[in-house]
Amino acid sequence: MPRIKSAIKRVQIAERNRLRNKATKAMVRALMKKVISLSTAYAANPQQETLQEIQAAMSAAFSRIDKAAKTGVLHKNTAARRKARLARIVKLSVASSEKSQAEALVEHG
């Protein structure tokens, strides 16, 4: 254990920052999981409300990821990769649901 007052303070600050960073990373993961679960739900049962929820959740996730990158919790390339993955997942789920809707219209029309 440190004996010098400034070293003791640095240990306290490091612990505080570690807990803050841990909470930020957990929030990013939770928001990403929410976007992914909403997009899979939309792919299974496409509804306009679900699409709006996806857009809102994606906006919140992007905002939190950008903030984590800005404060140094995440590396900027890691943040960019996570945002790209989320965007790709949402794009694929929306495209697959639109494709299935078009096929259903062709069958019934």
UniProtKB/Swiss-Prot annotation:
Disulfide bonds: none
Alphabetized Pfam families for the sequence: Ribosomal_S20p
InterPro entries associated with the record: Ribosomal_bS20, Ribosomal_bS20_sf
Keywords assigned: Ribonucleoprotein, Ribosomal protein, RNA-binding, rRNA-binding
Secretion signal span: none
GO molecular function terms attached to this record: small ribosomal subunit rRNA binding; structural constituent of ribosome
UniProt-listed GO biological process terms: translation
PANTHER family for the chain: 30S RIBOSOMAL PROTEIN S20 (PTHR33398), SMALL RIBOSOMAL SUBUNIT PROTEIN BS20C (PTHR33398:SF1)
Family: Belongs to the bacterial ribosomal protein bS20 family.
Name of the protein this chain belongs to: Small ribosomal subunit protein bS20
Source organism of this protein record: Synechococcus sp. (strain JA-2-3B'a(2-13)) (Cyanobacteria bacterium Yellowstone B-Prime)
